[in-house]
Curated annotation (Swiss-Prot):
It comes from Streptococcus equi subsp. zooepidemicus (strain H70). SMART domains: THUMP. Keywords: ATP-binding, Cytoplasm, Nucleotide-binding, RNA-binding, Thiamine biosynthesis, Transferase, tRNA-binding. The lineage of its organism: Bacteria, Bacillati, Bacillota, Bacilli, Lactobacillales. The gene is thiI. InterPro entries: Rossmann-like_a/b/a_fold, ThiI_AANH, ThiI_fer, ThiI_N, THUMP_dom, THUMP_ThiI, tRNA_STrfase, tRNA_sulfurtransferase_ThiI. This is Probable tRNA sulfurtransferase. Its EC number is 2.8.1.4.
Length: 404
């Protein structure tokens, strides 16, 4: 027998009261995005669960695509059959025969929401269990911790059989908690910050600053590849490329070297905030980890944050670098993040950046610039690309094509 669908059990959605269907519909849309590479698959949601109808698609590939999606508590590949006793007996015998090995233990666990069905759960357990013994005389029944628990569910529309329970990613469906702008540098920390925000239901748009010719097409490709890795957790992500060359050249020529990083980060934050307002997001997200680099001391954060009153979420702020790396490896962003391409935060990095910048000094140096004009031109020049979770192509080949 072939699996007919994947049954998705909802995670924290069961606690969301009046918003429950909104959250479920959000999860359904995210699943559809993640499974866009499987056009034959259809998705149907109810208050209790979501049904992913395979329609001939490979069940293992679909399961692997669903496992990282936030909002899913668990997955079970199921066989959908007619809800008649003879059909159920034949199905149970076929399934258990395919699983049988010497010494295997099993139990049947039935439940019914269709109370018009001819057998109650207890009688159905006995009938189907007897059918298994008829087909496999040497198999053993075991009520506690058997090797196989064959679940049989009688619903209004059909009967469903399953014997696998696969753990989902948990969390909330991406988008259920609103939208935030992720400042995505291309390093190790910011993709992890994006991942942790996605887990709590925040839809992210990735804001990446590019300064050609100082930053290369490879650096831009790297940031897009990181964004694509993040799409596995909740579907499509808007990638926003910000032209930053003019601003970085201005800062380099007009400000003291020790303040380059502070001024650069203040401009980045202003621009991200302007894009956030334009695109109706609620928060800014970044990968700052306290004390990790000069711009991430409390004094630096205070001086940089002074340009906005928008909430800034820092999911990795209290993590050690090794903790962040561990998550990056788990979500498959680490190998991309360590590719040796320069980004906007490294190309003009001073040898001795200020770790305790005085706000009065920062504002005095900033008075040398046309701040509003620089920000407006950067925002006007953004390029937005929708990144999807389609099957990835070789990044090097893609980069060569772009260069040609």
């Amino acid at each position: 027998m072939k699996y007919s669908e994947i049954m998705v059990r909802h995670g924290e959605l069961s606690t969301k009261g009046k918003n429950r269907m909104r959250f479920i519909n959000r999860l359904k849309a995210n699943i559809q995005d993640v499974l866009s590479a499987y056009p034959e698959v259809t998705v149907r949601s109810t208050r209790d669960r979501t049904h992913v109808l395979l329609n001939g698609a490979d069940d293992r590939s679909v399961i692997e695509a669903l496992k990282p999606v936030f909002g899913i508590q668990g997955l079970s590949p199921v066989y959908k059959v007619e809800k008649s006793v003879p059909v159920l007996i034949a199905a149970v015998q076929e399934i258990m025969s395919s699983l049988y090995r010497e010494g295997l233990t099993f139990k049947i666990s039935s439940k019914r929401s269709d109370h018009q069905f001819e057998l109650d759960s207890r009688d159905l357990n006995h009938t189907l269990g007897a059918a298994v013994f008829e087909a496999l005389p040497h198999i053993k029944a075991q009520m506690k911790n058997p090797d196989v628990t064959l679940k049989v569910e009688i619903r209004d529309e059909a009967a469903y059989l399953s014997h696998e329970d696969i753990k989902g990613a948990g969390g909330l469906p991406v988008g259920a908690s609103g939208k935030g702008m992720l400042m995505l540098s291309g390093g190790i920390d910011s993709p992890v910050a994006g991942y942790l925000s996605l887990k709590r239901g925040v839809e992210i748009e990735a804001v990446h600053f590019a300064s050609p010719p100082y930053t290369s097409p490879g650096a831009l490709r790297k940031a897009k590849d990181l964004t694509q890795r993040l799409t596995r957790f909740g579907g499509n992500i808007q990638f926003i490329e910000v032209p930053f060359t003019e601003i970085q050249e201005e800062i380099k020529h007009k400000a003291p070297e020790a303040y380059l990083m502070t001024l650069t980060r203040r401009f980045m934050l202003r621009i991200t905030d302007a894009i956030r307002e334009k695109r109706k997001a609620l928060v800014i997200i970044n990968g700052e980890s306290l004390g990790q680099v000069a711009s991430q001391t409390l004094e630096s954060m205070q001086a940089i944050n002074a340009v906005t009153s928008t909430p800034i979420i820092r999911p990795v702020v209290a993590m050690d670098k090794l903790e962040i790396i561990d998550i990056a490896q788990q979500i498959d962003t680490f190998d991309i993040s360590i590719q040796p391409f320069e980004d906007c935060c490294t190309i003009f990095a001073p040898d001795r950046p200020k770790t305790n910048p005085k706000l009065a000094n920062v504002e005095r140096y900033e008075s040398r610039f046309d701040v509003d004009g620089l920000v407006e031109r950067a925002v006007a020049g953004i390029r937005v690309t929708e990144i999807t979770p389609e099957i990835e192509t070789d990044s090097l080949s893609t980069l060569i094509e772009e260069l040609l």
